[in-house]
């Protein structure tokens, strides 16, 4: 029994040594794993920071592209016209910008920073919007279809006026800057050929008094372009502008003219005022006798 005790003690000491060795190895492994664990968060944080910086740079780049495209959409007239009707893609905006720059380049290399030319573009856009609103008002509010004589006359006059001012703006392009005040003066303009032919045909079939014919002859001599567009002194439409039954007689349709109009100075001188007889109380009675609603602006449109 005495011998067994040291053996037991020796085996117990060996177990203690193995336990201590395992503890030391475990401590060493624990230190290594803790070192690896302390290094992995730093590397992962660096990777995350790098990805975050890359995302911020990419977002700033996209913001610059979007801001530039929005500026181009505002500055290019054709893109500015379409931004309310449909959503423009980036490629379409860039294509419109290229087309606009080509147009400016073919115009002589001028107008890149010309404020007047840019204002003329926006005035043409305004006239197109007004033309579209007039057609919309006549169709929705007044209930006039496309074959109505009043709508046909008004649309034909506006289309003809737009083409005339387009040609006039092209003729005045080489004269330099046109002051804004001249756009509101009385510029001569040519009457519509359809209106001229119809008015001359209507005047041959009617008889007028000598005083009225003499007065109209003086007006035609002084202003030959305004003779076919001024309202008759009798207050009614008369035989000056007969009814145009078909819209196919118009040279440019409404949609194509709205898409093809260009810059031109708008002149209020072409829209003549009504005569005093047109505002007399007999005008509502005549309209009531005809069974049509009273439109005081109808006589002014008939003057076109």
Curated annotation (Swiss-Prot):
- Annotated ranges, domain bHLH: 49-104
* Annotated localization: Nucleus
In Gene Ontology terms, what is one molecular function of this protein? protein dimerization activity
Q: What cellular component GO annotations does this protein have? A: nucleus
Renumbered to this chain, motif YRPW motif spans 294-297
The cross-references to InterPro entries, in alphabetical order and at most eight, read:
bHLH_dom, HES_HEY, HLH_DNA-bd_sf, Orange_dom
Name this polypeptide is given: Hairy/enhancer-of-split related with YRPW motif protein 1
Task: Write out the similarity annotation.
Answer: Belongs to the HEY family.
Q: Which gene encodes it?
A: HEY1
Which keywords belong to this entry? Developmental protein, DNA-binding, Notch signaling pathway, Nucleus, Repressor, Transcription, Transcription regulation
Q: Where is region (Disordered) located?
A: 1-52, 197-234
- Oligomer status and interactors: Self-associates. Interacts with HES1 and HEYL. Interacts with HDAC1, NCOR1 and SIN3A. Interacts with GATA4 and GATA6. Interacts with CCDC89/BOIP.
**Highest taxon of the source?**
Eukaryota
> What does this protein do, in the record's words?
Transcriptional repressor which binds preferentially to the canonical E box sequence 5'-CACGTG-3'. Downstream effector of Notch signaling required for cardiovascular development. Specifically required for the Notch-induced endocardial epithelial to mesenchymal transition, which is itself criticial for cardiac valve and septum development. May be required in conjunction with HEY2 to specify arterial cell fate or identity. Promotes maintenance of neuronal precursor cells and glial versus neuronal fate specification.
Give the residue ranges for region: Transcriptional repression and interaction with NCOR1 and SIN3A.
Answer: 48-117
* KW DNA-binding (keyword) present: yes
Q: Native species of this protein?
A: Bos taurus
């Amino acid at each position: 029994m005495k011998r067994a005790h040291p053996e037991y003690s020796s085996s117990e000491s060996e177990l203690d040594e193995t336990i201590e060795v395992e503890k030391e190895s475990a401590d060493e492994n624990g230190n290594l794993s803790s070192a690896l664990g302390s290094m992995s968060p730093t590397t992962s944080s660096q990777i995350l920071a790098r990805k975050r910086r890359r995302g911020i740079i990419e977002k700033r780049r996209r913001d610059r592209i979007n801001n530039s495209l929005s500026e181009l959409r505002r500055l290019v007239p054709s893109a500015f016209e379409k931004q309310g009707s449909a959503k423009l893609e980036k490629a379409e905006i860039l294509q419109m910008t290229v087309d606009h720059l080509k147009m400016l380049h073919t115009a002589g290399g001028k107008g890149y920073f010309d404020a007047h030319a840019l204002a003329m573009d926006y005035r043409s856009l305004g006239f197109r919007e007004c033309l579209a609103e007039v057609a919309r008002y006549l169709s929705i509010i007044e209930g006039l279809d496309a074959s109505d004589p009043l709508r046909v006359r008004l649309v034909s006059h506006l289309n003809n006026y737009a083409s005339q001012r387009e040609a006039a703006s092209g003729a005045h392009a080489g004269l330099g800057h046109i002051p804004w005040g001249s756009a509101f003066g009385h510029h001569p303009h040519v009457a519509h050929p359809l209106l001229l032919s119809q008015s001359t045909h209507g005047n041959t079939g009617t008889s007028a008094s000598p005083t009225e014919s003499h007065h109209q002859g003086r007006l035609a001599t002084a202003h030959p372009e305004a003779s076919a567009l001024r309202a008759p002194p009798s207050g009614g439409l008369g035989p000056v502008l007969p009814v145009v039954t078909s819209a196919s007689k118009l040279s440019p349709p409404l949609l194509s003219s709205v898409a093809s109009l260009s810059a031109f100075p708008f002149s209020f001188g072409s829209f003549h005022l009504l005569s005093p007889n047109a505002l007399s109380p007999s005008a509502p009675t005549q309209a009531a006798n005809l069974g049509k609603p009273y439109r005081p602006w109808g006589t002014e449109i008939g003057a076109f």
